[in-house]
């Protein structure tokens, strides 16, 4: 090979390598930059807006493969009757969401709703939820809550798209029949922080009640603690952090052993005083810890707000919306357009 040809090839390879390096850096930079702006580019704290015939409530969130999967209660006024469903939508940027998909049947005697959270168990996704029977509940009736037959269930999926039929969780133990379990709502599942394979179910009954299992079939009742509803529990180092909803706002408690709980911080009400859509009540905080996700690096909270009227005044099955906020420390919270 002539010397001039060798020089030419060397220059060509050098330029090609440089171009590839620049291209890879460009792709990485733009991806990272886009990730960094996910929270900054949300232009409204409202993710799903309710109206006079629709309510979005009780959010549950999963962050998986760079996507947010949001599950929630969808309440609809259909032909003068009020129905509750479990529904879902997903997004990569928290601004553009997929079409809402209803996962549960239209049946006032069941009203599957209030999804708590999703876990990964036995190579499947598991979603916990409740029934909320309100048979004969019509538009214009006084606000009615789920009756004494409200129970908690799980559904399973391989792909987050197709779900099994709901299965009852007999969280009071195998010897307690379904009709003796008592009214229970708002389930949440979490693996024990110290014992792998031991799973806890938190649910609203006598404050917050707790049961545990090793197989999701045989359950042991553990006890209860003073708490509001819509419990969400995170494991943070050697501690459990529980978010719960009293009559208004979102409270936080912490515990090392699930028996002794101490209040943490102040009641969280975010921008409620300035939000007509949440002036009636702000509640049901579902928090996901994304501090280790590059470009997000926050706790992200989804919640629902009802308004402008109080829920007892009618804005329970209508005019309820899902909102978003985030924090680095669970004390100071930010939201779009703050």
Each model region followed by its residue ranges:
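Bacterial Sec-dependent N-terminal signal peptides
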Residues: 1-35
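Carbohydrate-active catalytic/glycan-binding domains of CAZyme proteins
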Residues: 34-338
């Amino acid at each position: 090979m002539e010397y001039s040809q060798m020089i030419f090839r060397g220059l060509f390879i050098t330029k090609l390598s440089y171009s590839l390096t620049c291209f890879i850096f460009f792709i990485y930079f733009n991806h990272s930059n886009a990730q960094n702006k996910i929270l900054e580019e949300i232009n409204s704290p409202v993710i799903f807006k309710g109206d006079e015939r629709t309510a979005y409530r009780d959010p549950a969130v999963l962050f998986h493969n760079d996507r947010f999967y949001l599950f929630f209660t969808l309440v609809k006024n259909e032909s003068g009757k009020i129905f509750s469903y479990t529904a879902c939508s997903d997004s990569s940027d928290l601004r553009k969401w997929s079409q809402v998909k209803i996962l549960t049947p239209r049946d006032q005697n069941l009203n599957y709703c209030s999804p708590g959270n999703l876990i990964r168990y036995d190579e499947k996704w598991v979603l916990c939820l409740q029934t909320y029977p309100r048979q004969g509940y019509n538009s214009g009736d006084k606000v009615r809550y789920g009756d004494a037959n409200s129970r908690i269930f799980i559904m399973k999926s391989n792909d987050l798209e197709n779900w099994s039929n709901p299965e009852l969780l007999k969280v009071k133990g195998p010897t307690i029949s379904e009709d003796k379990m008592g009214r229970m709502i708002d389930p949440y599942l979490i693996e024990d922080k110290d014992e792998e394979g031991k799973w806890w179910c938190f649910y609203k009954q006598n404050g917050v009640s707790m049961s545990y299992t090793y197989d999701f079939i045989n359950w042991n009742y553990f006890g209860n603690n003073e708490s509001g509803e819509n419990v969400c529990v995170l494991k943070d180092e050697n501690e459990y952090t529980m978010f719960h909803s009293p009559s208004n706002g979102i409270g936080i408690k912490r515990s090392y052993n699930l028996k002794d709980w101490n209040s943490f911080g102040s009641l969280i009400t975010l921008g409620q005083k300035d939000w007509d859509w949440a002036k009636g009540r702000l509640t049901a905080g579902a928090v996901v810890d994304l501090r280790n996700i590059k470009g997000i690096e926050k706790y992200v909270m989804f919640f629902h707000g009802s308004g402008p009227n109080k829920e007892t005044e009618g804005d329970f099955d209508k005019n309820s919306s899902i909102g978003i906020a985030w924090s680095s420390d669970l004390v100071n919270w930010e939201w779009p357009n703050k």
